[in-house]
A protein has these predicted regions:
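Active-site-adjacent mobile loop/cap segments within catalytic or ligand-binding domains
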Residues: 186-197, 214-265
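Short glycine- and acidic-rich boundary segments immediately preceding or forming the N-terminal edge
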Residues: 5-47
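Conserved beta-strand scaffold positions in the cores of enzyme catalytic domains, especially
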Residues: 33-34, 48, 98, 176, ...
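Short beta-strand element of the alpha/beta-hydrolase
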Residues: 57-67
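Short, Gly/Ser/Thr-enriched beta-strand-loop segments that form substrate-interacting elements
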Residues: 35-38, 205-215
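Short beta-strand-to-loop junctions in surface cap/lid or active-site-entrance loops
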Residues: 47-56
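Active-site metal-binding loops of divalent metal-dependent hydrolases
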Residues: 66, 102-104, 181, 234-237
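Active-site/substrate-binding loop(s) of hydrolase catalytic cores
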Residues: 57-58, 71-205, 209
Length: 265
């Protein structure tokens, strides 16, 4: 149904470099993105990168560009792949899995758009409890049927959200880091474990828990599935923070993981 007129790129770097801020071809190629069986609505490959040193004690899933017009989120995921390849001074051995662009159709659209090719906000399409009731009411009453926030006809109606759920089931992360823009804050959804403290800041971004939305990844992962979800809202959609700032955010994340995440082997 969906492939007409669309030429699938054999490797993503030409398209990513042309579209993403602060991403040159050597950086993208060094990320060594691997194709998956996952496809977008328009048939684009969903790419991942695994960094697994072996004998990992913690698994962390990093997701960028759930919203296709938040270009900086995919850029920072690619920058962080480079950092994840360096040995880290921390007690955990981490298996990282990066999905830099969950919504490539929105990202590579001209102009880029928040929703996927079906017009669905992927971050409202995850199967949170009472989705059928709450997501529709929230969209109609709170957003006044904003088309940029349409949750879809049913939970997991979209191939991209189904792919992410399947990745979560396969990978079983102990932490999910979801990168967005442009609110310039840090959000956290997590299990109500006593003593579990979210990160207070990453770089210049400070914790400001913005609430729970029906169908969001934070609600699904953090509240429903009990997997902590750190949501990074970069300050700008079309520009990344400075390289030193992205590195500081990375180091702050590692420090928090060292203090708060429990190894499960």
């Amino acid at each position: 149904c969906c492939m007409a007129g669309f030429a699938q790129s054999a490797e993503p770097c030409d398209e990513f470099v042309a579209r993403l801020p602060n991403v040159k071809k050597p950086l993208c190629e060094a990320a060594k993105l691997q194709p998956t069986a996952g496809r977008s609505v328009n048939g684009r490959t969903l790419w991942v990168r695994d960094i697994n040193p072996g004998n990992a004690t913690v698994r962390v899933l990093v997701v960028g560009a759930i919203h296709g017009d938040e270009l900086s989120s995919a850029s920072m995921a690619l920058q962080w792949i480079r950092m994840a390849e360096q040995p880290a001074d921390m007690p955990h051995v981490v298996h990282w899995r990066f999905i830099p662009a969950l919504n490539p159709d929105g990202l590579l659209n001209k102009p880029p758009k928040r929703v996927n090719a079906n017009g669905v906000d992927l971050n409202r399409n995850f199967p949170t409890p009472n989705w059928e009731r709450d997501a529709k009411i929230y969209w109609e009453k709170r957003t006044r049927k904003d088309p940029r926030r349409f949750p879809g006809p049913k939970p997991l109606s979209e191939p991209e959200s189904r792919f992410l759920i399947e990745e979560m089931q396969r990978f079983k992360p102990q932490l999910i880091v979801s990168i967005h823009a442009p609110y310039g804050v840090l959000d956290f959804d997590g299990p109500a474990k006593e003593g579990f403290v979210p990160p207070s800041k990453l770089g210049r971004l400070y914790l400001d828990q913005v609430g729970i939305f029906p169908g969001s990844l934070g609600n699904y992962g953090g509240v429903h599935k009990g997997v902590p979800v750190v949501t990074i809202e970069l300050p700008k959609s079309t520009r990344t923070p400075l390289d030193a700032e992205m590195r500081q955010m990375w180091l702050d994340l590692l420090r928090w993981m060292s203090e708060r995440l429990r190894s499960e082997g």
